[in-house]
């Protein structure tokens, strides 16, 4: 199969935080068009591929992306014209060679990823296939269990909570549609509880609430209360997941972690997590240690990795080399997958494949700076990942992904699978 790319064009648009980002359109010879917008993170891992920003303080506080846009229009486009849009791997390799750096700092990961995603969309549209079927083939059928970020802290909020995300996980639901309902009803119950306690119920970047509470544990207790208030059973219908983002409160000089008002050593932090795991139905903990603290991950995984999903985000940055190291060290049993951490569709699929073949789960993830683009919803189903993290139950850029998953579930009909607890295949529950 062969279809030529006849046009590649990029423009500067805005993300959900009002910051510029890159949108790319790719046109094929049959008139098919693929469009994609690149997301952007707030708490970024130091090993992520480079997001190119202009640095011109007179425009968008230095966050403009005209250089990345120019790189697409002037440097990338001429190289792709006439190439076969159906050969995603070849096209992504052309992009990587054109950039030639380890972290995509020449062209920018935001330029490369925008093109990579848009090519995939254009090819799918040309074949009149849904994106998940194009990327995943006939066996793409698993709807993901959502990890819904309803209380925000850390770098995502201006409050006193250290842990970045407190999530509800409706793994006990029979279908994705019902899981979404469980989540939405719990979200509304949570809002009512916070309001009655006198907390502000404005939402943060990812659509969750950002109350000032006594400590991190109180946030978990409030979630349990909300789950019960919505008529569900914690630990049966709905579980809890945490994204600690520990690199954000790690002190490199002392080697300690500042959490809940005091400094903790690695061993003290592990005991803190273990006490939470024993008290509450916590099914997943992301980035519990600094992104270079491999030993802490190894120790923690050895102690609790059989019953709790330990997710590496900043640890791996969707990078096959770092993931391979984690596999060899047995550092975690799960990886967070973010397209823009690595910067191309092919490399993302490679990371997912490597994790799967080593019995690690994949959690497909959004970024805090998102857009209306729903690529990750299709990616989750395409790869049968079984898990997705795409924010709370408010803000259209988050809901867009959930609504796309509803459409996919409907389209798949009886073939659709929602695996619930079985999606957490790297642990025993």
Swiss-Prot record:
<dbReference type="GO" id="GO:0006096">
    <property type="term" value="P:glycolytic process"/>
</dbReference>
<feature type="active site" description="Proton donor">
    <location>
        <position position="206"/>
    </location>
</feature>
<comment type="function">
    <text>Catalyzes the reversible conversion of 2-phosphoglycerate (2-PG) into phosphoenolpyruvate (PEP). It is essential for the degradation of carbohydrates via glycolysis.</text>
</comment>
<dbReference type="GO" id="GO:0005576">
    <property type="term" value="C:extracellular region"/>
</dbReference>
<feature type="binding site">
    <location>
        <position position="368"/>
    </location>
    <ligand>
        <name>(2R)-2-phosphoglycerate</name>
    </ligand>
</feature>
<keyword id="KW-0460">Magnesium</keyword>
<dbReference type="GO" id="GO:0009986">
    <property type="term" value="C:cell surface"/>
</dbReference>
<dbReference type="InterPro" id="IPR029017">
    <property type="entry name" value="Enolase-like_N"/>
</dbReference>
<dbReference type="GO" id="GO:0004634">
    <property type="term" value="F:phosphopyruvate hydratase activity"/>
</dbReference>
<feature type="binding site">
    <location>
        <position position="164"/>
    </location>
    <ligand>
        <name>(2R)-2-phosphoglycerate</name>
    </ligand>
</feature>
<dbReference type="Pfam" id="PF03952">
    <property type="entry name" value="Enolase_N"/>
</dbReference>
<feature type="binding site">
    <location>
        <position position="286"/>
    </location>
    <ligand>
        <name>Mg(2+)</name>
    </ligand>
</feature>
<dbReference type="GO" id="GO:0000287">
    <property type="term" value="F:magnesium ion binding"/>
</dbReference>
<dbReference type="InterPro" id="IPR020810">
    <property type="entry name" value="Enolase_C"/>
</dbReference>
<feature type="binding site">
    <location>
        <position position="367"/>
    </location>
    <ligand>
        <name>(2R)-2-phosphoglycerate</name>
    </ligand>
</feature>
<keyword id="KW-0964">Secreted</keyword>
<comment type="similarity">
    <text>Belongs to the enolase family.</text>
</comment>
<feature type="binding site">
    <location>
        <position position="338"/>
    </location>
    <ligand>
        <name>(2R)-2-phosphoglycerate</name>
    </ligand>
</feature>
<feature type="binding site">
    <location>
        <position position="243"/>
    </location>
    <ligand>
        <name>Mg(2+)</name>
    </ligand>
</feature>
<dbReference type="InterPro" id="IPR036849">
    <property type="entry name" value="Enolase-like_C_sf"/>
</dbReference>
<dbReference type="InterPro" id="IPR020811">
    <property type="entry name" value="Enolase_N"/>
</dbReference>
<keyword id="KW-0324">Glycolysis</keyword>
<dbReference type="GO" id="GO:0000015">
    <property type="term" value="C:phosphopyruvate hydratase complex"/>
</dbReference>
<dbReference type="InterPro" id="IPR000941">
    <property type="entry name" value="Enolase"/>
</dbReference>
<feature type="active site" description="Proton acceptor">
    <location>
        <position position="338"/>
    </location>
</feature>
<dbReference type="InterPro" id="IPR020809">
    <property type="entry name" value="Enolase_CS"/>
</dbReference>
<feature type="binding site">
    <location>
        <position position="313"/>
    </location>
    <ligand>
        <name>Mg(2+)</name>
    </ligand>
</feature>
<keyword id="KW-0963">Cytoplasm</keyword>
<protein>
    <recommendedName>
        <fullName>Enolase</fullName>
        <ecNumber>4.2.1.11</ecNumber>
    </recommendedName>
</protein>
<keyword id="KW-0479">Metal-binding</keyword>
<dbReference type="Pfam" id="PF00113">
    <property type="entry name" value="Enolase_C"/>
</dbReference>
<feature type="binding site">
    <location>
        <position position="389"/>
    </location>
    <ligand>
        <name>(2R)-2-phosphoglycerate</name>
    </ligand>
</feature>
<keyword id="KW-0456">Lyase</keyword>
<comment type="pathway">
    <text>Carbohydrate degradation; glycolysis; pyruvate from D-glyceraldehyde 3-phosphate: step 4/5.</text>
</comment>
